[in-house]
Regions:
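Phosphopantetheine-dependent thiolation modules in NRPS/PKS and related acyl-activating systems
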Residues: 2-41, 45-47, 51-85
Length: 85
């Protein structure tokens, strides 16, 4: 995993999976309400994020993630933890 996160990478990944433009993927956007992601889209996105960023998203964390920003904060936290280790 890279030591520095780039939001544009997450935008591109989410846009590719959701079939939307990268600039539509913003921190304040809801996966389901704003980006029209269904449960299959979310499973695919989470699998891709776990692969790309070498993280595991526990189910209890997934249940809290409603916005792109929630996922981004989780990734920032995991990156910070790795840098401290």
């Amino acid at each position: 995993m890279a030591t520095q996160l780039d939001f544009k990478e997450l935008q591109g990944l989410a846009a590719e999976i959701l079939g939307i433009e990268p600039d539509e993927v913003q921190l304040d956007k809801s996966f389901q309400r704003d980006l029209a992601a269904d449960s299959l889209d979310l499973v695919e996105l989470i699998a891709a994020v776990e692969d790309k960023y070498d993280v595991e998203l526990p189910e209890e964390e997934l249940e809290k993630m409603k916005l792109i920003g929630d996922l981004w904060k989780f990734l920032e936290q995991k990156t910070a933890e790795r840098l401290e280790a």
